[in-house]
UniProtKB/Swiss-Prot annotation:
This is Elongation factor P. Gene3D superfamilies: 2.30.30.30, Nucleic acid-binding proteins. It is found in: Cytoplasm. The gene is efp. One of its GO terms (molecular function) is translation elongation factor activity. Involved in peptide bond synthesis. Alleviates ribosome stalling that occurs when 3 or more consecutive Pro residues or the sequence PPG is present in a protein, possibly by augmenting the peptidyl transferase activity of the ribosome. Modification of Lys-34 is required for alleviation. The keyword Cytoplasm applies.
Length: 188
């Protein structure tokens, strides 16, 4: 893999730091009037999603990470692992429940997700930006009950709970933004 000097650090670059993959979110090169130049770097740990801020000397260099974002179809959950398949090679990957994390509530059969692989091992799963799911449970919206926010909680067929308008009923299909967890529209 390529080696990157701290001068080459750019937003989006994926590197190995302390034997783990990180994605650089921002890098600021600082050249003080006195002393050695350095780079102030904000990066995200890909295994956990935590953010770290580090300072590197201008002479420091790090290895590039062998990290690949791949489109894969979600197949099923066997209780212990989530199974994904590459749509062209039909190669299947098992992903641990802790790796899928909060994304699990947005997964539907055959949904195309972005699976991040590090050395061929899945480390993160991003669900599609929007899903269409049926409402399995919600309170009936009473006519004239518009005091307050004008929304009510609804449980989707995936198990996720989202806030929907009062006019939405059980059995209707709604479109939801998985990045924010917000209702977008009804699907006709």
């Amino acid at each position: 893999m390529a080696t990157y000097s701290s001068n080459d650090f750019r937003s989006g670059l994926k590197i190995i730091f302390e034997s783990e993959p990180y994605a650089i979110e921002s890098s600021e090169f600082v050249k003080p009037g006195k002393g050695q130049a350095f780079a102030r770097v904000k990066m995200r740990r890909l295994l956990t999603g935590s953010r770290v801020e580090k300072t590197f000397k201008s002479t420091d260099s790090l290895e590039g990470a062998d990290v690949v974002d791949t489109n894969m179809n979600y197949l099923y959950n066997d209780g212990e692992f989530y199974h994904f398949m590459h749509p062209e090679t039909f190669e299947q990957h098992q992903v641990e429940e802790k790796t899928v994390g909060d994304s699990a509530k947005w997964l539907q059969d055959n949904a195309e997700c972005i699976v991040t692989l590090w050395d061929g091992r899945p480390i993160t799963v991003l669900p599609p930006n929007f899903i269409e799911a049926e409402i399995t449970d919600t309170d009936p919206g009473l006519k004239g009950d518009t005091a307050g926010t004008g929304g009510k909680p609804a449980t989707l067929s995936t198990g996720a709970v989202v806030k929907v308008p009062l006019f939405v009923q059980i059995g209707e299909v709604v479109r939801v933004d998985t990045r924010s967890g917000e209702y977008v529209s009804r699907v006709k």
